[in-house]
Amino acid sequence: MSQTSLHHARLDWNEAGTPVSSEFGDVYFSNDNGLSETRYVFLQQNRLPARFSHHDSDIFVIGETGFGTGLNFLATMAAFLEQAPQSGNGARLHFISFEKYPLTREDLRKALAAWPELATFSQPLIEQWPLPVAGCHRLLFAGGRIRLDLWFGDIKEMLPQVPHPADGLVDAWYLDGFSPAKNPEMWTQALFDGLARLARPHATIATFTCAGFVRRGLIAAGFAMQKVKGHGSKREMLAGERAEKQPQQTIAPWYARPAGRAGEVLIIGGGIASAMTALSLVERGRRVTLLCQDGEPATGASGNRQGALYPLLNGEHDVLSRFYSLAFGFARSRLLALAKRHPVAFSLCGVTQLGYDDKSAAKLAKMAQGPFPPELMQVLSEPEAEQVVGLPCGHGGVSYPQGGWLCPADLTRAAIKEAQASGLLEVVFNTEVVAMAEQADGWQVESRDGRRWQAPNLVVAAGHQLPALIPFAELPLYPVRGQVSHVPTSVSLSKLNTVLCYDGYLTPAHHDHHCIGASYGRNQTDLEFRADEQAQNQARLQACLPQQAWPAEVDVSGNQARVGVRSASRDHLPVVGPVASLAKLADHYAGLQGDQQNAAPLPLHPGLYVLGALGSRGLCSAPLCGELLASEICGDPLPLAADLLEALHPARYWVRKLLKGKPLQ
């Protein structure tokens, strides 16, 4: 699926103060008490209050075909929080919705002002409102008890990309949107079939319309439909239920992501990846034990004073750009939420990337032709770059206005403290894991001093040490040594307004010092200070801005620096997910190139997962990767499209070879 350009909804406002779509000439909600209609049509006809109280699972999943102002979601959230506690601890709501033309934040605020009784719920939605970037945006509410997946883009393109188990995903559908007469492109048989494909057996469905072709289409898709009394003056509407169904799935069997085992999760790590995974797991009620090699968290690659937060985009507008643009939004939301409750040094001052030579300028120019909204990326001329940066650069470039810098160690500690507050996370420091063994019902790990832990599920998120801990996975990852220099500020450097990226990066001042870096030593793991790398960090800035005087004020002579080692992959994407049994893979998929129809699910080491290869963009990718892994282990809806899940799968290197008929070795 390629990345497509979106534009915001164009609104008019009628005499009743109701938003009206300029594209479709239809209201977003009824002039006559839209909230009452929502409660009657969608909550009551899907029997939700009773089902919230007595659901047979710890998670209830609702799907919706048109998000609009979010009124349906907010009313559902209010009802869930009122009813669900009766079903016991751990009851969670997952709401999946689609929107082709997202509102602007200000239009959303104005529309929802009509419902002051929902202000407690609408304010967090407004605060987290995503950028208009195509794909799935995951938002969190009520301390993680409620998750909203907003799929921005045409539902015809998005719906087939929603990953789901073979027996379905959705417990109740809201078939909403502008009326079939005003928006016929949405109300198609392909849509009805897609709703049925994602529906679990006996899932319910409700819609405000009673159009005959809608009823017939839903019946043809596999729903048993009936006419019921409509809301208010509307005579009739439709409600129904999904019958038994044949198993169907979106994800290819060789990229399978089955749910993990019930029970505790062990995590080996101590940096931002393990912290974010632990947080996402405890939000789902899982008990987690985090085994950290060091005496405190974030002493490895996550321990720098300042790190840049911005998406990794390219001119190809491929899975790389799509993943990082979505990960960036989730990372910002996590940062802002955690910083409200824990001390995190950060500044969303923006990031400026310079076209410092012909090659980099051409790369940025190609990237600028892509489907990225100005809220995510803006092209800067040379004068504009100087104004934004605060210092003359001699080059134009691009700005990421919602990016900035943060202290990785602070964010890691904040995520751990937040998870510990639940009472579900135990952190064991000074624990170097040296052995692990697969058992019939889980995994056992052993530390160097002979202590042992056992759990049904094991996550290895140990940075560059990951391949050594699970050598049998043979993941083609490599370590990268990086030295970041800490330099005192100066008269000129103190004027730096944004993070500045060139063939390196320079951060604005924090505690009268800047970070400049970083060196790049592939397949190097030593942590010794190197004077030549200190000099190189300064030299790269001067080489990229040769006509400017202020880079000479960067003083590295104090030899203040920090060295870390990160893990990277050759395709610049993380590895997130289950670990395949490489010993079985070749025989299992011997004929995969010629016979993909009858392929069996990927042979796995049950209960074993990895999260790694975050490279230099861990601040951007770690929160969403941790959320993905927790979703997978718990059997929740996954926060990415199917093709992005394939691109992140740890087995992708081997499966691609087999699909081409090549040997694994």
UniProtKB/Swiss-Prot annotation:
Keywords from the UniProt entry: Cytoplasm, FAD, Flavoprotein, Methyltransferase, Multifunctional enzyme, Oxidoreductase, S-adenosyl-L-methionine, Transferase, tRNA processing
Signal peptide interval: none
Cofactor entry: FAD
Biological function: Catalyzes the last two steps in the biosynthesis of 5-methylaminomethyl-2-thiouridine (mnm(5)s(2)U) at the wobble position (U34) in tRNA. Catalyzes the FAD-dependent demodification of cmnm(5)s(2)U34 to nm(5)s(2)U34, followed by the transfer of a methyl group from S-adenosyl-L-methionine to nm(5)s(2)U34, to form mnm(5)s(2)U34.
Organism: Aeromonas hydrophila subsp. hydrophila (strain ATCC 7966 / DSM 30187 / BCRC 13018 / CCUG 14551 / JCM 1027 / KCTC 2358 / NCIMB 9240 / NCTC 8049)
Name the UniProt record assigns to this protein: tRNA 5-methylaminomethyl-2-thiouridine biosynthesis bifunctional protein MnmC
Record region (tRNA (mnm(5)s(2)U34)-methyltransferase): 1-243
Highest taxon in the source lineage: Bacteria
Any one annotated GO CC term: cytoplasm
